């Protein structure tokens, strides 16, 4: 077998006559009109400016210009926001002055603190915090990203946590655990949702996200510098 570790895609930034430059693209989007608000909001946060809007019955065509890095990780979100009914096309406009900071990622990472096998009980306690990427029985290790947090903060978690056994066991208590189906990672989804300090691991059988620094102490040292 084989294993690859892939970092987040990055655009080429260059300097021309002392001015920081980056590639820009023109984006044309056709969507049902009920989804235009979500598209405009998402691309606006990613540094795109709407240049034109054309209405046609229940459809709308939106045209934007913005930095290429703002498109990285957006296409999967676009499918979600438009329920698969949108069409997106883009073309390169060339290099323009750097657009500044943009918002690409609004979720944080759930990071496993331990090596072992994920248990339903442990995952049940995490699913209200965000979206999981694994099923019960998945092998996890320290530094592996097992899900995301909806509030944007990073959280170190224990997906291997089991139910404490007692002498008095409630009848039917094991049947009370209901898990929401996880968002299983593919290469495409992983490349779009990964953070700057994460790697995408690809093997013949698995696609996983992990932190570049696996232990919490290493990550704290890196953030303190």
What are these regions (language model features)?
Residues 1-225:
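Accessory interaction regions appended to the cores of large information-processing enzymes
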